[in-house]
Amino acid sequence: MLRVSENGLRFLLKCHSTNVSMFNRLLSTQIKEGRSSIDDAGIIPDGTINERPNHYIEGITKGSDLDLLEKGIRKTDEMTSNFTNYMYKFHRLPPNYGSNQLITIDKELQKELDGVMSSFKAPCRFVFGYGSGVFEQAGYSKSHSKPQIDIILGVTYPSHFHSINMRQNPQHYSSLKYFGSEFVSKFQQIGAGVYFNPFANINGHDVKYGVVSMETLLKDIATWNTFYLAGRLQKPVKILKNDLRVQYWNQLNLKAAATLAKHYTLEKNNNKFDEFQFYKEITALSYAGDIRYKLGGENPDKVNNIVTKNFERFQEYYKPIYKEVVLNDSFYLPKGFTLKNTQRLLLSRISKSSALQTIKGVFTAGITKSIKYAWAKKLKSMRRS
């Protein structure tokens, strides 16, 4: 494991940012001086990529003038991928690093989500909301009841959290609560390491909340060992309580998702880049091999529905990443992953973690809630606009 001081890590990030900025300035100068001309199809012949209004882009080999800066960017990408201490405690991050993750939402919904989060007496380090209860999806009629709110609670000590929460909200738990908080926290570690309590009534809202240790959360977004939470965080989420460690590693998680999505988009579109398809590829990553799809528990059009309704949110969420990966050709994948082996590795890990989480859910939710949840998911998957 590479060890690096916080100052060293900030220097590494600053170097990367400086290289990208210099790359952009040099590219801009080249274009302004006429060393590159833009053809009618929206292509920059020196090999950079130019976004068109319809989101189609085509790339050609870069000119030699940019090689040096490209190498600098790739070198810092490589050094970053070798830093794997996901439990490292950051006191601060470079200005604006990861600020794209802090999405704003409707004030009324923000108030509701803050109310749900603050209702827990047990301490949490990181909290985010996700899913159709936070971000609307296309393909579902507005006449249906408001969807369940999904949130994830990152905690330092799961046993301590469950001990306090069981006393405050015993009705949220299945009969597993009778075995005590220590047992529940150990049971939580099965599969992806998340303990879900669905259909919890909190401040008049139907809420499904998952409890995960910070170590499990950070390990997944840094190394993709299960891809269960890393995949969720690759789609727009609403962060309700932030943690700098998550902000740092999730920025790399987004960059890795963009790296794969760009590759798959170009591969499927004869080397033409489509921004809508790019976000669909990102969204689809976490559903490959998901047992819920095999069992018909998810809408087969879910990926398209998510991106259709949230295209601008994806643009906001990935704004600096898009510039780095798509426009400047930066590349990042977690250690051990390559463009050739990623599909195989993710398929295996997602299949395993989703299957174990589904089985575990029968015990954590209880039979009645499990049937209710499965039926709700089935009905939701059958709805069409």
Curated annotation (Swiss-Prot):
Impact noted for substituting D220A: Completely abolishes the enzymatic activity
GO MF term set: phosphatidate cytidylyltransferase activity
Record's keyword terms, sorted: Lipid biosynthesis, Lipid metabolism, Magnesium, Membrane, Mitochondrion, Mitochondrion inner membrane, Nucleotidyltransferase, Phospholipid biosynthesis, Phospholipid metabolism, Transferase
UniProt feature coiled coil, ranges: none
Secreted recorded as keyword: no
Annotated compartments: Mitochondrion inner membrane
Domain of life the protein comes from: Eukaryota
Protein name: Phosphatidate cytidylyltransferase, mitochondrial
Gene source species: Saccharomyces cerevisiae (strain ATCC 204508 / S288c) (Baker's yeast)
